[in-house]
Amino acid sequence: MSVRVRARRVLSALLTALVVPAVVVAGLSISPAAAHAFSRDGLPVEYLDVYSTSMGRNIRVEFQGGGPKAVYLLDGLRAQDDFNGWDINTAAFEWFYQSGISVVMPVGGQSSFYTDWYSPSALNKQTYTYKWETFLTQELPTYLATNKQISVTGNGVVGLSMSGGAALILAAFHPAQFRFAGSLSGFLNPSTIFMTNAIRVAMLDAGSYSVDNMWGPPWDPAWRRNDPTVQAQALVAAGTRLYIYCAPGGSTPIDDNTDAGVALSASSLESLAVAGNKAFQQAYAAAGGRNATFVFPASGNHSWPYWGQQLQALKGDLIATLNG
């Protein structure tokens, strides 16, 4: 099969995944409006409104104190404006309760890739410019240090799907702040021609956001600046502890109660991510990287049950790294 035919088929799979009426998958697919795993009553979860000078507005942050070090949990492409997807779809606050680690969940940022954009999204007439990297690495850490006694250094960041690559990029360019970075089903080679087009389609579907306002045309340097595979050397040089998970698609017992259409969507999306993860692994090894765990199971889909499972799997490593 030629590369062109394969690319056309994979892009078709992405389009199919985007229009399937999924109710439990997230990231580059359709995520639920209704929550089913909010934090139980009694957990010390706070809802903070943190003013972002760079974006000219308050950003909601879900926060659970637990120690001076924190893990930042980033959301997927269809991030909602009321709660973070990790709280909506998993028991992440419960898992980290009394772990000695604080939990920081920024809310919002649909289609943002948690990056600093060039300008407001033109297609949906966005009224301000996303400046998520600035918020996460300057404004929020300052607020948390002042008000919640969270260290500005030696923390962790974990992302899924859209934010998997963002987590690695944040760690690559801000190594003092993040000594641990995890990517779950992330898109780790976004500057390839195929992925630039796939991301364009996905962002149009998720809120009519314009990728041109984010990183410009495909040849703009911002694409490579925000490509974890290109930046693998920086992660190696910093000695950042990494956890990388991605499956090739295909159902497992986790999907037993999942609608067939939803499972197809999730499988298609996961299969899109795996090539970029393998490319990152190769670049990381070529740069001399020896401080990463790579988890590539034989099957698995692009959905919250898998990401919740992997967050629990990496938890011990994360805590040991932050407390080390």
Which stretches of residues belong to each language-model region?
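Non-catalytic cap/lid and distal C-terminal segments of serine-dependent acyl enzymes
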Residues: S12, T16, G27-G324
